[in-house]
């Protein structure tokens, strides 16, 4: 049976070691996962990472939430500056997920995967509202990370320069798309590419 919650949010905070790489899932920063994310980072801090040379941060499916929940992961990465950094992306990354992407790029990540579902300059910090039988997501802030500008009111937005409003599209360093055949066979095209990318760099 199709698990919609798993598809929508994934398994934030879940991680595994594959040879000399840490693969960490940062698939949601919704408030409901706050404790889960914090506990996973605390657990990671106790792991022996001496033989881990690469951090693969998988933000695929991260449609946003509370951008402050990105900080636990980013601080952990900053405390391990000797590790190579790779970020996996897909079309389901939005809002605070794109903020995590920009943070990882700032930390030197090589991006592998698909284009994300939103421009780099976008609306974020959204809240969900239920009205009758309908659920709505309402964003309350506009961000342009590259120009370090933001707006929270109609007046502030109208006063932004045209440059600050111009759409900025993210293109991964290495474009890799999940194939239909691999999906049917349970193969993660993008992760497999990243693991082979690491292997080839070390040959």
Task: Write out the residue ranges for each language-model feature.
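C-terminal "post-core" interaction segments
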Residues: 1-203
């Amino acid at each position: 049976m199709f698990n919609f919650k798993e598809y929508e949010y994934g398994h934030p905070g879940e991680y595994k070691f594959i040879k000399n790489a840490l693969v960490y899932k940062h698939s949601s920063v919704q408030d409901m996962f706050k404790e889960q994310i914090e506990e996973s980072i605390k657990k990671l801090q106790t792991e022996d990472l001496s033989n881990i040379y690469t951090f693969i941060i998988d933000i695929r499916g991260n449609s946003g939430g509370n951008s402050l929940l990105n900080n636990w992961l980013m601080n952990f990465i900053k405390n391990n500056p000797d590790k190579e950094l790779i970020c996996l992306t897909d079309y389901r990354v939005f809002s605070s997920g794109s903020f995590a992407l920009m943070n990882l790029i700032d930390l030197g990540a090589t991006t592998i995967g698909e284009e994300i579902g939103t421009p780099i300059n976008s609306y974020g910090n959204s809240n969900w509202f239920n009205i009758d039988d309908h659920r709505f997501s309402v964003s309350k802030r506009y961000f342009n990370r590259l120009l370090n500008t933001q707006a929270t009111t109609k007046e502030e937005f109208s006063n932004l320069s045209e440059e600050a409003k111009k759409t900025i599209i993210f293109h991964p360093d290495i474009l890799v798309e999940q194939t239909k055949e691999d999906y049917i066979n349970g193969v993660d095209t993008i992760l497999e590419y990243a693991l082979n990318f690491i292997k080839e760099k070390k040959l």
